[in-house]
Regions:
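Structural marker of alpha-solenoid helical repeat scaffolds
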Residues: 8, 42, 76-80
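Canonical positions in the second alpha-helix
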Residues: 4-5, 38-39, 73
Length: 97
């Protein structure tokens, strides 16, 4: 279903994010990370994709990349005024040290 939506509109943030989440749930981390990255490439203000990409990277032990995703996500939060997500992501940054 999501693939069909993306065939019609490859920039659909919700569908692409959903596909990334499905890959992550299946343990397909590389595929999930690719889809999170594509989501933010097409939709740079789609904050959830940054946060979930960072969480996926943390699970994979890729802390430096997770920090970079969180920093990009914090910039998106600032652009969109998403204080709640910014607070959560800032907490993640602090936990990473």
């Amino acid at each position: 279903m999501l693939s069909g939506i993306l065939e019609q509109n490859p920039k659909d943030a919700f569908a692409r994010y959903g596909l990334a989440m499905a890959f992550a749930a299946e343990g397909k981390m590389d595929e999930a990370l690719r889809e999170f990255a594509t989501t933010t490439e097409y939709n740079p203000d789609y904050v959830p994709a940054y946060q979930m990409a960072a969480q996926t990277l943390i699970k994979a032990g890729r802390m430096d990349e997770a920090r970079a995703r969180l920093q990009a996500g914090l910039a998106a939060c600032e652009r969109t005024g998403n204080a709640h997500a910014a607070s959560e992501m800032q907490g993640m940054v602090e936990e990473l040290g």
